[in-house]
Every structure is written in C-alpha cells, then in structure tokens.
Amino acid sequence: RIKITDGVIEPVPLAVPKFLSEIIAVKEIAKNISLLISEDLTKTGLFRIIPDEAHISNVTNFKASVAYADWKAINAQGLISGAVTIAKLKKQLCLDPRGCLVVKFKLFDIFAENNIFNNGQKIYAAEPGEWRRLAHKIADDVYFNLTGEIGYFNTKIAFISESGVKNNRLKRLAIMDYDGANVEFLTDQSDLVLTPRFSPNGSRLVYTSFKLGEPHVFLMDIKTRGSFVLDERNQMSFSPQFSPNGQSVIMSVVSGANTDLYTLDLRSGTRRRLTSGPAIETSASFSPDG
C-alpha cells in the first residue's frame, strides 16, 4: 500500500542578473528593476532565484550570445537578461524632458537553449519614475511564458485606509500596487467611504460614500480623480459592483423599508430593478459572462 501524504512542488530555478544600464543615470534603476522582478517571481512560490554570486557567466553585453553551459552548470532553467536607458521615442511621449525610461529584456530556456520570445526581445517604456510598473510588467511576461497563466504583478488593490483614535476612526479611499507600494489616497478624511470596486480595465472605481449624509454609490475616474454620484434619485444606495464589460453597475437601493438590487447602465443612465422581495438584497456581483 502507498500512503500519499503531501505533494511536493520544487520551485523552478531562474537566473536574473542585474539589468545593464546603458547610461550612468539609470544604474540604480536598472539594479532595482531586476531585484523587483526577482521578488515578484519568488513570492509566487513557483520560482527560486539563483543568487548572483553563484553565477559563472556575467552578463556584460545585452546582445552577446548566451553561455548556456555556464547556466546549466548552476542548474538554472531560465535566464532573464535586460538593459535600461532613457531615450526620446517617436511613438511614445513622456513628460520627463530627458525622455522615457526604456527597458528591453530577453527570456531564455536554458535546457532547450533558445530565446522564448519569437522576436528575440520585448521592450517597455514609461516615465522614469514608473520603473516599478515596468518591472511588474516584465514579471507578468515571464510568469505567463513559464506557467501559461496571466500574471498579476502589474495590478492595483483598492482599499479603505483607516487612521485616528479607536472611537473615531477616519476612513479614506486608497489604491496601491499589489505588493503594497505606491499608496495613493483618493479621498480625504471628511466623509465615510466603503466597498471600493475597480472597473474591469482598472480606470475607474465605484464605491459607497456618505458625502451627502446618507450612503450613495459614487463613480471615480482614477486618472483625473473626478467623482460623481451615480444615481441622483433621492434614495440610499450602496454595495456597488461593475459588470464584466464595465458598462453597467449593480448595487443595492433602499426604497422605503425595502432594499433591492438594481442595475444602472452607465451610458444611458437607465436603471433596472432586479428584485422586489421583502428581504434585504445586498453585496451582489455578476457572473463572468454577465
């Protein structure tokens, strides 16, 4: 008889040498990008990053051939190499007068001895201050190509930040990167806010606010920080959620002594009642196909 107790998952060993800096101004950024990629992949539990001091080969030229034998010798199954610079691009305008932060990188299968990307490399560009976002996007690419699953590193979390004394907590609507970095407060502490939810494309939020004295569902454009109450009827509303296509919102609406579910079309403003029973219906969400 064979008794099965636990499954064993061995993390895939990857090499992520420090990205090359093509100009001195981005030396520290290049180092931080490679470190953040390593942190992202390590947190999944699926990958183990081989320490730099164990590397036999040093990547000193982004265009140089890969010494596969050296990477096999330290049991690396994958290699991520990259280079960073700042340049002015024709297809992308950055506000920084120096230009955009440009990161190019390659992903190699060491045992198959090939470059995983069909065109040899990938290139991302953004404002120089957005290097963390570029690192997360690269980690997403690596994760997808090695697991077949969509990465989640370049994502945001919406939450309610609390501060103040125990009996008078102040709440603010906030967002942050998935790893807790880049916290941004979207509202002040003057009004109670609850239940933030992202739109499918991540550009908007719906949430419950007591700004008008009673709970009402608000919609905010994250880029402009502009917000407005979704339904101007004189009824309390709360617990919103976007539809999968982002074109409507489902929420709870109070009418008299009854609380029912409604959908609101964001394009036409048309409201449709979904329930009419005596019970309180709340915290609804759509199925994946809407």
Where are these regions (language model features)?
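A short beta-strand motif characteristic of beta-propeller blades
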Residues: 182-187, 226-231, 270-275
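A flexible loop/linker signature enriched in serine peptidases of the S9 family
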Residues: 150, 162-172, 188-191, 208-218, ...
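Amphipathic beta-strand/beta-sheet edge segments enriched in Tyr/Trp
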Residues: 62-141
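Short loop/turn segments that connect beta-strands within beta-propeller blades
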Residues: 111, 177-181, 221-225, 265-269
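Hydrophobic beta-strand positions that form the internal "hydrophobic ladder"
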Residues: 157, 202-206, 246-250, 290
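Short beta-strand->alpha-helix linker/helix-N-cap micro-motif
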Residues: 3-67, 80-86
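Extracytoplasmic
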Residues: 9-17, 28, 32, 44, ...
